[in-house]
Each structure stands twice: as structure tokens, then as C-alpha cells.
């Protein structure tokens, strides 16, 4: 992974913009998702929101009033940045597979190869946002492995977001003994956020 000089501002400016924009959008009418371009935008923004709000929420809960102070520590910042991108990478996979599986099951959409096209495009676009190249390459390989094994007919209803929930548990820069105590809460926090995304997708789907 490349070396980045990180600060609180660098890490959170784009991240919290996504989070706050998602909150704002909750109060305005949402248009239907009628094209693959709109689906791509949905996958990217919702994956970013879920990964960021669950990671930062967990860190804030565990660190309490010391939360902000830790962001002056370069070693900790690198750990948070590493966690952020790795969790996001798995979240992207989960939501891509879920949406295309749901499309196939409910609308008889058959061109599931477009899932790979959209997923790879999102990752390539993230280069400009400093997503580390080694994570991008590893994520593409992992996606290909999952792609070869996926059952498109059932994925959407078969614990589709467990991998990203486990990713938060794995990558969050919290002491292992504390994470062990928090395991159920951590996993549930991710699944609950995905439940919101699933509901929105089902309501907005206009294919």
C-alpha cells in the first residue's frame, strides 16, 4: 500500500460529505433507478455510505471523547484509511451482487456480466480518490472469484451482506479483545444499514 500523509480533514471531508448528503436525500423524493448508469451511482454511493457510517460509528462508540484526538496520530490514521478502503471494497461487491441478483430474480434481467463491468468501472474511478492500487487489484481478483461461484437466482436472499459485515469486524482498528466482545453488535450494525439500502433499492427500482 502506498504512503499517504493523512489528516483528519483529508480522511473525512469526502467521507462525511457522502454521509451528510445521504441524510439530506432521505428528506427529498427519490427518483426511480431506470438505467445501468443510475444503478452504478446507487451502488457506489450506498456502499460508501454504509462502509463509512459503520466504521466511524464503531470507532466513535469505542473511543468516546478521545475519538477526535486519535486522528492526530499518523499510525492510527493509516489504519483507519486501510480499514475504510478494505471495507468499502467488500461493500461494493456485496451490493453489486445483490442488485444484479435481485434484478434477475424479479425482472428476469439476464445480462449479469454487466455487474463486472460496472464494478470494475467504479474501482477505476476510485483511483482519483486515492484508493490504493494494491487494494483495487486484490478486490478485482476477489470479485472474479465470487463471480465464478455466485448463484444469481438466490444470492439476494441468502445473507448477501455478510461479507461486508465481517469485513468491518476484521479491519476496524480496535483491539482484538474488544472486537471479540463487540462481534454481534458490529455485525448487526452493518446488516441494519444494509436493510435500509435494500428497502430503498426495492422501492426505487424502475427497470
Predicted region positions:
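Leu/Val/Ala/Ile-rich N-terminal alpha-helices, chiefly Sec-type signal peptides and the beginnings
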Residues: 2-71
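Short, flexible coil/linker elements and helix-boundary hinge sites characteristic
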Residues: 5, 28-32, 104-107, 129-130, ...
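Alpha-solenoid helical-repeat scaffolds
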Residues: 10, 26-29, 41, 45, ...
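Non-catalytic, well-ordered alpha-helical scaffold segments
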Residues: 49, 53, 85, 89-93, ...
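Polybasic, proline/glycine-rich intrinsically disordered low-complexity segments
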Residues: 49-52, 61, 113-191, 207
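Alpha-helical repeat scaffolds in large eukaryotic proteins
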Residues: 56, 60, 64, 96-104, ...
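N-terminal interaction modules that seed assembly of large macromolecular complexes
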Residues: 58-108
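Long, hydrophobic alpha-helical segments that serve as membrane-spanning/inserting helices
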Residues: 189-205
Amino acid at each position: 500500500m502506498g504512503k499517504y500523509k493523512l489528516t483528519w480533514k483529508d480522511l473525512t471531508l469526502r467521507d462525511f460529505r457522502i454521509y451528510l448528503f445521504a441524510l439530506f436525500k432521505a428528506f427529498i423524493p427519490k427518483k426511480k433507478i431506470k438505467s445501468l448508469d443510475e444503478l452504478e451511482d446507487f451502488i457506489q454511493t450506498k456502499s460508501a455510505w454504509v462502509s463509512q457510517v459503520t466504521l466511524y460509528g464503531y470507532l466513535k462508540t469505542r473511543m468516546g471523547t478521545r475519538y477526535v484526538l486519535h486522528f492526530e496520530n499518523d499510525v492510527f490514521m493509516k489504519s483507519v484509511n486501510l480499514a475504510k478502503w478494505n471495507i468499502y471494497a467488500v461493500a461494493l461487491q456485496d451490493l453489486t451482487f445483490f442488485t444484479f441478483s435481485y434484478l434477475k430474480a424479479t425482472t428476469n434481467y439476464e445480462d449479469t456480466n454487466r455487474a463486472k463491468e460496472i464494478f470494475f468501472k467504479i474501482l477505476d474511478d476510485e483511483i482519483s480518490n486515492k484508493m490504493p492500487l494494491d487494494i483495487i487489484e486484490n478486490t478485482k481478483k476477489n470479485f472474479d472469484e465470487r463471480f465464478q461461484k455466485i448463484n444469481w437466482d438466490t444470492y439476494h436472499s441468502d445473507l448477501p451482506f455478510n461479507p461486508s459485515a465481517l469485513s468491518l469486524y476484521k479491519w476496524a482498528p480496535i483491539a482484538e479483545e474488544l472486537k471479540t466482545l463487540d462481534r454481534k453488535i458490529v455485525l448487526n450494525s452493518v446488516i441494519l444499514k444494509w436493510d435500509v439500502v435494500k428497502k430503498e433499492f426495492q422501492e426505487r427500482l424502475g427497470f
